[in-house]
């Protein structure tokens, strides 16, 4: 009985050891590559966390393929853990109009991260979607989704837009859609 318990314990230990990811690249899905990544201490635990945006390797300018956004938390033992994934936040490559790919940047500050977009033609627009890590619930929620737009011939006449304001500080990261 003791030998059997030792074998089971060893198998469980080795399985969990090999399941841990030691590199951000270990989270890249088959057929995808990293479009962008940014690091910071999102969950305020003292370890480096990452926001990673993936792109489909077969993505073309006209494609409307998903661009997964991954939240990856650094762990005490030097490994990484997937804390969240959402395929509906990063706008498609063709969604930027004449400007092409609207994706602009990821920014991280404290326990917030934002995904920034810019696009348009004569009518230009920007959009910033921000999420906040809630240290009590240990989850990410939508903090703000807003942007601005202007006509290229009248750049001083800026219009401000709030998207899904009724969901701010309520909807979880995993279920939010930028549509």
Residue ranges and their predicted role:
Residues 42-54, 107-117:
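Acidic/hydrophobic-patterned starts of short beta strands in beta-sheet-rich repeat architectures
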Residues 66-67, 101, 123-128:
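Short, surface-exposed coil-to-beta transition loops
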Residues 22-24, 107-179:
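Acidic, small-residue rich beta-repeat scaffolds with periodic aromatic anchors
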Residues 33-42, 101-110:
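Beta-propeller blade termini
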Residues 27-28, 58-65, 119-122:
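Short consensus segments that form the blades of beta-propeller domains
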Residues 20-32, 77-100:
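Blade-edge motifs of beta-propeller repeat domains
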Residues 61-86, 131-133:
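Beta-propeller blade repeat segments, especially FG-GAP/WD-type strand-to-loop junctions
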């Amino acid at each position: 009985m003791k030998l059997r318990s030792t074998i089971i314990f060893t198998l469980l230990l080795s399985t969990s050891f090999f399941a841990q990811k030691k590199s951000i690249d270990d989270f890249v899905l088959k057929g995808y590559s990293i479009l962008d990544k940014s690091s910071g201490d999102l969950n305020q635990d003292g370890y480096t966390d990452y926001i990673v945006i993936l792109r489909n390797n077969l993505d073309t300018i006209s494609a409307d393929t998903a661009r997964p956004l991954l939240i990856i938390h650094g762990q005490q033992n030097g490994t990484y853990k997937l804390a969240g994934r959402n395929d509906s936040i990063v706008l498609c490559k063709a969604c930027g109009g004449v400007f092409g790919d609207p994706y602009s940047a990821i920014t991280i500050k404290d326990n917030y991260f934002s995904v920034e977009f810019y696009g348009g033609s004569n009518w230009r627009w920007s959009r910033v979607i921000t999420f906040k890590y809630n240290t009590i619930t240990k989850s990410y929620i939508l903090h703000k989704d807003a942007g601005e737009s202007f006509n290229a011939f009248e750049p001083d006449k800026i219009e401000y837009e709030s998207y899904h304001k009724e969901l701010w500080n309520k909807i979880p990261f995993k279920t939010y859609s930028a549509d």
